[in-house]
């Protein structure tokens, strides 16, 4: 009997989390082996490790507690990897040497796969004097371009895809350039960007007051605060960036306000961190804790089980601090000094649906607040008991801690316990993006987001090269089907497309009240929302206590979300209508950089005395590696003319960008009337098919397409089923139109790809 609620869950486990040897030999035979591996590794610091291993295994079993993907993939593997998802890097000095020292640290961190966040407000503005060199400063945006190039280079070397967050204060003299930087579609593609909005700035926006842009006490320019706010809003309305972070609120509510100042976040925004701070993340799966789902007057979330699970999860995550490696020693020291963790939730929308409550309603906000308050109380209680057993975090100061942040709203029983025993972890709660692990857990709703699609189809590549369609159903919807058969879904089953923006904000605000760190959430707004109404969303987020706001409005720039009727392709994949004999260009060809990286493959065709040497060079576009050109060389002059023609044609197709995987399919479909050959135990029908196989292997190796089981980049006409949902943009990993903005990250519901990792 499988533990997986859906085939996609098992495939994601196999692809991302299952332990395998370097040669591909499977070491985790079952998902139980994966759970046991994690439990054993995280129980090692305990005096009674065997007993705690069993408790940790019980928490992991059936996907009740979901550690972040880094922990699932890396714990107990003996590999030199970090178990932390992301980092905020050190403060950037305003000097050339200091700036490039920070670039080196960023490269070393990203090389190990960690996403990074930086505040670029510390770099002097463009045009400022540079003493001693008789020159003007180039400004922080120019150095962000260097960081962006570094990220592309790290990815082109085969490392995990990069994610970076850049922040800038709302009073920095270069803030106007920062706001509009991503209106250039080719610039800063590897960055998420957010403006640090201070409380005085927000008050000046309300009163239409003036606003000074300053650096080191010097006023460079004065603008109207409302005009600057409108520029931020217009850029976000049109390009989905920059986001807005209410930085004074973050610092005022920080448990560690007495010993640190925060000016940056991790790439997805749920962890505001000090210099060298690190994200340690895990999620309670609320959907697994609902008893008597869909039974009127009986369905409820078992809060006693929740308390026990939270206590175990806190202990597990605390042990990760000691078990993990870190890219930099400064990161290890920061983690050890404060031992902050980010315990959150996933499956909230599913749990609400299972107890009969409509996501976004006042009742949903009330329940969300209640459940997260319960989690916070259980987490702080567990951490206090851990402190009594193992010691408080080194920078703990009882009076200062109890007067700060989350402690101001905590009940007296917990406060007294902390004063008596101390507390092991400085901060404990955070709502992180959970797109991939939520699919791993059976496609539960992600984080505190609404259900995005009740059901959809994806295409899966089979061993014989054919593709099958597979329905992927939301966890709660599938449970409804299992219990109620064909009965229609009740009205309280809503999705992200049917919710008003104020419903999203209401839920985020309800959650933020009980979360000591921050929340990664996307507020989906309709394409036709007016600019004034759009601005109101951000002001509502500020007024209701949110620590930040991220929206997604589909449009021609960000990627439209299109309705698809039965049997009809999305408009953007239909053939163009050609009037008369006009030539229609699919896309402008990409310019060739001066130098490209690639691979050369040797193919020995049995019917030829001489081998073919196939060179495929790649280019990085929008943070994604893709084939750009092909060359074929051989001593066999019989092949010369057609190989030149073939490679010129294939290269011309590649340079147009987009989905070029059809080249593989067309080549592999060619049969030679003289017969094919057996190569590596497989029949290949022609030398052209062999070339197609090489190109396919290369595309898989660079991550342009997926291998067997996870779907080739293919026919985009995947239909959304049941609730007439709408497909999203094309996924850069699997090519299916199931890429959506969820929790501040572009996440694919077909293969689990997430920009945030």
Predicted segments, located by residue:
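Active-site cavity-forming subdomains of large catalytic enzyme subunits
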Residues: 3, 84-303, 326-333, 379, ...
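Core structural elements
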Residues: 59-76, 170, 314-322, 334-356
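Conserved phosphate/anionic-ligand binding catalytic regions in large, soluble enzymes, centered on
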Residues: 75-83, 87, 95-119, 167-169, ...
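Internal maturation/activation junctions in enzymes
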Residues: 216-218, 309-332, 336, 340, ...
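Catalytic alpha/beta core of large soluble enzyme barrels
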Residues: 270-272, 317-322, 404-405, 417-424, ...
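Short, Gly/Pro- and small/polar-rich lid/capping loops
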Residues: 415-417, 564-613, 718-727
